[in-house]
Amino acid sequence: MNIPVMPKSIISIINYQSDAIVSKQLLKKNNGTITLHAFDKDESLNDSTSPYDILIHVLEGTIDLKVNGTSNLIKTTEYFSLPAKIPYSIEAKEKTKVLLTVIK
């Protein structure tokens, strides 16, 4: 894991890939992880559940975050905190970069 010595734009760390979700783990510790995801438009992460609390932060773009069947439109600079063991899914409404923080 490379931690930059100088400030770096977080959205420049990862690039979009056509018809895919690209992931890059930025930090992995005993108490949690931080992962950057780049979703191409209409790509989705379906029926996920985390055993830990998570924070979903949209850095660029827009997602439809479904939690227990309820849609939440999350846009650039907005975030959503999700308790452990709650089912969720993410669909990118446009090309979107998301920072996912898991706290154990």
Model-identified regions with their sequence ranges:
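A short, N-terminal "cap"/entry segment at the start of jelly-roll beta-barrel domains
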Residues: 1-31, 66
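Conserved short histidine dyad/triad with adjacent acidic residue
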Residues: 20, 33-50, 76
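Structural motif
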Residues: 33, 62-64, 87, 97
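Glycine- and acidic-residue-biased ligand/ion/polar-headgroup-sensing regions
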Residues: 52-64, 68
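A cytosolic small-molecule/anion-sensing beta-strand core signal
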Residues: 59-60, 75-76, 94
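Short acidic-glycine-tyrosine-enriched beta hairpin
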Residues: 69-84
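Ligand-binding loop in jelly-roll beta-barrel domains
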Residues: 84-104
